[in-house]
Amino acid sequence: MIQELGVMLFKEREKMGEKQKRVADGIISISEMSKVESGGHEIDYFTLQALFERLGKSIDKLELAVSGEEYAAISYRAEIEHSIAEWDHERLTELIAGYDTYNDNKRSIHKQYKAALWAMACYMKKQDHASCLCGMEQALACTLRNDWRRALGAGQRLCNQEIRLIMVIAYCLWELGDISGLSGHLEQLCSYILHHYTDTEEQVKVYPHCAW
């Protein structure tokens, strides 16, 4: 099924007139993207999800039949997010330490997620916005080569994970009083979500974070 989704990704990208580079950049190489889109190469669930999200599409509604390992990885992330919602620093750090057991730590999307989790764990313990900002910016750089403000202006495609990181970064900047041009950049981000996240399922994932 994962391989079939690669072909679907190709068809969707072609229909939208998007180049491979704009979708794959920072997540996987162009050569690997070609193999995925031909159905001849499998990548993990979260990496594939990020590629679809950069097209504004959701793989959730496809009711994807995942393997036992992929289900365990998805469940593990859900447990991580629950620990954050419960503000349980000790549990979160335990879960971060075990993250690589379920995911490929060489993939940029997982490096980014893990880096963001460490930044969040640090914030939960110290409530230090400057440290959190630094950590989140480093996490975002795992997939975005340019500063996020410049990326928005250049029409960079973004996955859900990148959008959430940008929102946390914006929040930290606001708390630190560094608000020059911030509202304009956030308006650009909101406009991007409205125009490029065409699947309602993906919009629903992002809107609660926007409200927060």
Task: Enumerate the predicted regions with their spans.
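A short, Lys/Arg-rich alpha-helix, primarily the initiator
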Residues: M1-K15
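"A position-specific structural signal for the A-helix of alpha-solenoid helical repeats
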Residues: M8, I74, A78-E81, H110-A121, ...
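Short alpha-helical DNA-recognition segment
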Residues: M16-K35
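DNA major-groove recognition helix of helix-turn-helix/homeodomain DNA-binding modules
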Residues: F46-L62
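Residue signature of alpha-solenoid helical repeat architecture, marking inter-repeat boundaries
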Residues: E70, S108-K111, G153-E162, E201-K205
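Alpha-helical segment of the N-proximal tetratricopeptide repeat
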Residues: S75-Y102
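Short coil/turn connectors between adjacent alpha-helices in alpha-solenoid helical repeat scaffolds
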Residues: I80-H89, M120-G135, I169-S183
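Amphipathic alpha-helical segments of tetratricopeptide repeats
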Residues: T93-D104, E137-R150, G184-T198
